[in-house]
């Protein structure tokens, strides 16, 4: 995924009301930009740290700027626009980068499924049957470790998705939880038991029921983001 034009850079002053952030440009101009992230953004940002944002030319938008990338307290880069994850994964799927899911004949987005009224991010059609793929964006890192964690806040919705996938797996239908790691300097992923123990239990239960768990890391900068490598998932604390 190429940013065109390339992202603009600023310095974070504050994030507030979940969806707003004030930044300062190099020339001293201050802007309010949209924050497209409903999570806690734990360890994803710091006041005074560098941020990169895209700018829309749509005159109907109240806030033309959208926060895309943040400098973390550990000096990493994190893509904080969670809406990018599905597009990145689709791009990687179509390019054959995600080897475990290569060879599909059709791809459908946001397909209704399950007993709890969910929509799966992708349904892939293979000659031998479908695969249901749920995507989660991972941006939580910690100091002195290259292991990222998910989630960064309690997510009942995330646990519901795991239950839905587990139900499919028990029926013999291929079900995949895919973590898109939009954070530099990461070598593995784990469930964040310390933040949401219920989600971590649901993940381990889903794996026991046959759900596949994959993680792929992304390379990112102000010009592009691209999924480029598989990462191990560490299920045991």
UniProtKB/Swiss-Prot annotation:
Ranges that cross the membrane: none
Q: Which CDD domains does this chain map to?
A: SfsA-like_bacterial
**Superkingdom, taxonomy of origin:** Bacteria
For molecular function, the Gene Ontology terms on record are: DNA binding
Q: Name one Pfam family in it.
A: SfsA_N
Q: Matching PANTHER family, A to Z?
A: SUGAR FERMENTATION STIMULATION PROTEIN A (PTHR30545:SF2)
Family, per entry: Belongs to the SfsA family.
Q: What is this protein called?
A: Sugar fermentation stimulation protein homolog
- Which organism does this record belong to? Pseudomonas putida (strain W619)
Q: Which gene encodes it?
A: sfsA
